[in-house]
Amino acid sequence: MPYSSIDDLPASVRTHLPPHAQEIYVGAFNGAWQEYAWEGPEEREKSAHRVAWAAVKRKYVKMGDSWIARGD
């Protein structure tokens, strides 16, 4: 299911990502959810999460336990 806000994200995402990265995650997840409407429910969910993590990783890098904004 698409997320209405960052407050709706799973705790595993909310507690690890900074707020801006959470916004990226929500936007990418929701966009992918629409894009992959033809997939079955479980595969659609997995695909949307993969896209969301990829979007976050384009703007942030994980250093230790923290996600740091990329300088580029």
Region locations from a protein language model:
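C-terminal alpha-helical interaction appendages
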Residues: 1-72
